[in-house]
């Protein structure tokens, strides 16, 4: 059953080939059998999920209409609210926080009869690119348990890669869906800013965050977006970008002009560079023309991103003080000491580092030097993308400079920040992007290629990703690091 895409599972349910309860029990059995080695889930909602599965089976038995996600098991990153379920953001600060309401994406998934399996591990408050900054557990890459799955949506990528669920929700603030998707050999889609409601997402960078799906195939990205994309009265930043469905858009014509910022590829590991040019050749064989574009301003993207993101993080995380929200220290002599101790005990090192950086760039003495200049360069970067899209329909870029790194190779924080060079600009410019598996490195580790579109061109980007997937014949990659995960008689 794990070999079936979400679409195939839904069709099996509709055709009465299998019950939703049987599907749900099967995927819980996989999680309970193998996730101890991977560590993708922080918590499970088994009783809730099986109850919903039973209700959907009852609807089917009565001949009642069912939703487009009927019977599909879905994992949820642990910064997205599900009523009555803990939302910890993988932080001691929120270790005991129970969500009082559903995120809009969760509500829409359940309206379409999707089954929520549980909450997935992540870097604390979505700050990191290894999932090693979780306060509770490490998540290992299913391709090599000694390597990181990427981050911050590392639990989401690992769960889909291990086929614990065909769809997982992640959030992408600077590459946190696309990078782990590439590291784990799955598809990751970062929608345009405003395409998917952020209501019920614990904010990191409010002008950068976007919820999106991770899946095994692009068709399932389209299905997920059809279920939960679109305007939401609870999120004033959302827009109605789309006409028709994402699933219908997969059959559209492939864009003719694909732009590549070749001057920006020097930092790629050699086999990653070869793989990227092989991916471009796949698109050329479909009739697309590859042209060079100037995006030299991207050299400023990483410092601008860390100025803007850290400033927004410091502001958003100010609410977690032990009074309004979050962990409260056991003893303090006064209110100021209580604030300081609660935050010191509740936040990990990386979150603390970014709060300090954010407060520094927002300070009266430094705001003009850093934050205001950073936002000005961000505007220049947006203009550079707009100019590039006057010359091409889609931009192709690598997702990462290398495959997934080993635990022993985890770099110092600044070096890890520089690894975001191919992803953060998309968030700064509010654009959609999809990461699609593009093959394996010389070490047998998955690699990904990234297609970027104009803001609101999400359907076109999914179509490009689908076209690449079908013509490259790189589909449904199966990791082999966990014994029995794919050959242990669990069909």
UniProtKB/Swiss-Prot annotation:
Domain of life: Bacteria
Family matches, as PROSITE patterns: AMIDASES (PS00571)
Any matching Pfam family: Amidase
Catalytic center residues: 77 (charge relay system), 152 (charge relay system), 176 (acyl-ester intermediate)
Catalysis: reaction(s): L-glutamyl-tRNA(Gln) + L-glutamine + ATP + H2O = L-glutaminyl-tRNA(Gln) + L-glutamate + ADP + phosphate + H(+)
UniProt keywords, alphabetically: ATP-binding, Ligase, Nucleotide-binding, Protein biosynthesis
EC number: 6.3.5.7
Biological process, per Gene Ontology: translation
A GO term from the CC aspect: glutamyl-tRNA(Gln) amidotransferase complex
Gene3D superfamilies given in the database record: Amidase signature (AS) domain
InterPro entries assigned: Amidase (IPR000120), Amidase_CS (IPR020556), Amidase_dom (IPR023631), AS_sf (IPR036928), GatA (IPR004412)
Gene Ontology molecular-function annotations: ATP binding; glutaminyl-tRNA synthase (glutamine-hydrolyzing) activity
Keyword S-adenosyl-L-methionine on entry: no
Top EC class for this record: ligase
Function: Allows the formation of correctly charged Gln-tRNA(Gln) through the transamidation of misacylated Glu-tRNA(Gln) in organisms which lack glutaminyl-tRNA synthetase. The reaction takes place in the presence of glutamine and ATP through an activated gamma-phospho-Glu-tRNA(Gln).
Subunit architecture: Heterotrimer of A, B and C subunits.
NCBIfam families: gatA
Family named by the database record: Belongs to the amidase family. GatA subfamily.
Name this polypeptide is given: Glutamyl-tRNA(Gln) amidotransferase subunit A
Organism, scientific name: Chlamydia muridarum (strain MoPn / Nigg)
Encoding gene per record: gatA
């Amino acid at each position: 059953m794990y070999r079936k895409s979400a679409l195939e599972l839904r069709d099996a349910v509709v055709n009465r080939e299998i019950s939703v309860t049987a599907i749900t029990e099967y995927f819980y059995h996989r999680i309970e059998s193998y996730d101890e080695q991977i560590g993708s889930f922080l918590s499970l909602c088994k009783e809730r999920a099986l109850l919903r599965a039973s209700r959907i089976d009852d609807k089917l038995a009565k001949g009642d209409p069912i939703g487009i996600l009927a019977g599909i098991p879905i994992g949820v990153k642990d910064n997205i609210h599900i009523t009555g379920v803990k939302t910890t953001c993988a932080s001691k600060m929120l270790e005991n926080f129970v969500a009082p309401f559903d995120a809009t994406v969760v509500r829409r998934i359940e309206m379409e009869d999707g089954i929520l399996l549980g909450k997935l591990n992540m870097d604390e408050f979505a700050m990191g690119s290894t999932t090693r900054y979780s306060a509770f557990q490490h998540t290992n890459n299913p391709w090599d348990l000694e390597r990181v799955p990427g981050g911050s949506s590392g639990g989401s990528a690992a769960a889909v890669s291990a086929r614990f669920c065909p769809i997982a929700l992640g959030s992408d603030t600077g590459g946190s869906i696309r990078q782990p998707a590439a590291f784990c050999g799955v598809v990751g889609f970062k929608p345009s800013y405003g395409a998917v409601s952020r209501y019920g997402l614990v904010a990191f960078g409010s002008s950068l965050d976007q919820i999106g799906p991770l899946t095994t195939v692009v068709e399932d990205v389209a299905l997920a977006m059809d279920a939960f994309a679109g305007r939401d009265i609870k999120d004033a930043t959302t827009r109605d970008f789309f006409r028709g469905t994402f699933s219908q858009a997969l059959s559209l014509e492939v864009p003719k002009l694909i732009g590549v910022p070749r001057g920006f590829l020097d930092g790629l590991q050699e086999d990653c560079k070869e793989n990227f040019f092989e991916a471009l050749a796949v698109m050329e064989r479909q009739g697309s023309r590859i042209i060079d574009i100037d995006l030299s301003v991207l050299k400023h993207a990483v410092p601008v991103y860390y100025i803007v993101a850290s400033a927004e993080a410091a502001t958003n995380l100010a609410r977690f003080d032990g009074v309004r929200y979050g962990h409260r220290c056991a003893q303090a002599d006064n209110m100021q000491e209580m604030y300081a101790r609660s935050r010191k005990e509740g936040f990990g090192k990386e979150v603390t580092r970014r709060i300090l950086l954010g407060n520094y760039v927002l300070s009266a003495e430094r705001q003009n030097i850093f934050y205001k200049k950073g936002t000005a360069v961000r505007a220049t970067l947006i203009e550079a993308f707009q100019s590039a899209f006057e010359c091409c329909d889609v931009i192709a870029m690598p997702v990462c400079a290398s495959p997934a790194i080993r635990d022993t190779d985890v770099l110092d924080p600044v070096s890890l920040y520089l690894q975001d060079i191919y992803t953060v600009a998309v968030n700064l410019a509010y654009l959609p992007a999809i990461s699609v598996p593009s093959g394996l490195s010389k070490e047998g580790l998955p690699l990904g290629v990234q297609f970027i579109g104009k803001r609101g061109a999400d359907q076109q980007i999914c179509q490009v990703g689908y076209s690449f997937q079908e013509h490259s014949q790189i589909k449904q990659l199966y990791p082999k690091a966990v014994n029995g995960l794919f050959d242990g008689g669990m069909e």
